[in-house]
């Protein structure tokens, strides 16, 4: 029977360590392997020459412009920008009005004004501009309700302004559709 040797590997505490039995040929193979590994410790020969070229290659790879060789397709024909129709402009006005009505900052400032606080000049100007814009958008969309007192005094004026408002929209659409390139010499 061969020699039996205890293993040095830590096991469970108090548990008996198993006995490791090895053949003579296994021990020889392990010994040769350890000797080969021990011989090959250290750096490879000629490393000071080969490391420089690898570092240069790495620097070259990093310095290369990533935009070179792009596969992104570029359109050769530029399509003219599509002009918004009246209906699309009206839709965008509705969206802008909704955004202004749901503006949290404007709502808090209006609440402060209702509570009797005096706002600074800048904040008051901001509130006035936003309220004017809301009133303008409501007028363009036809959501603005005329006041009764002013309607009795000036009966003819709102009728004329309504016609003017519709003609203003017509003039605006006519201006946007007008091609200025035809006047270039």
Swiss-Prot record:
Residues 23-33, 48-68 have a biased composition (Basic and acidic residues). The keyword Glycoprotein does not apply. GO terms for biological process: ribosome biogenesis. Residues 34-47 have a biased composition (Basic residues). The keyword ATP-binding does not apply. A GTPase-activating protein (GAP) that modifies Der/EngA GTPase function. May play a role in ribosome biogenesis. This is Der GTPase-activating protein YihI. The lineage of its organism: Bacteria, Pseudomonadati, Pseudomonadota, Gammaproteobacteria, Vibrionales.
């Amino acid at each position: 029977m061969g020699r039996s040797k205890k293993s040095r590997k830590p096991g469970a505490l108090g548990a008996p360590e198993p006995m490791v039995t090895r053949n003579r040929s296994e021990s020889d193979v392990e010994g040769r392997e350890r000797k080969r590994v021990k011989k090959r410790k250290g750096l490879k020969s000629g490393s000071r020459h080969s490391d420089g070229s690898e570092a240069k290659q790495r620097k070259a790879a990093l310095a290369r412009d990533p935009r070179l060789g792009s596969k992104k397709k570029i359109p050769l024909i530029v399509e003219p920008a599509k002009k918004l129709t009246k209906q699309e402009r009206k839709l965008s006005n509705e969206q802008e009005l909704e955004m202004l009505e749901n503006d949290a900052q404007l709502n808090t400032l209006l609440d402060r004004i209702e509570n009797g606080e005096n706002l600074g000049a800048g904040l008051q100007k901001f509130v006035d501009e936003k309220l004017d814009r809301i009133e303008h958008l409501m007028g363009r969309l036809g959501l603005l309700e005329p006041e009764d007192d002013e309607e009795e005094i000036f009966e003819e004026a709102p009728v004329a302004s309504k016609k003017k408002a519709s003609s203003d929209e017509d003039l605006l659409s006519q201006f946007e559709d007008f091609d200025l390139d035809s006047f270039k010499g």
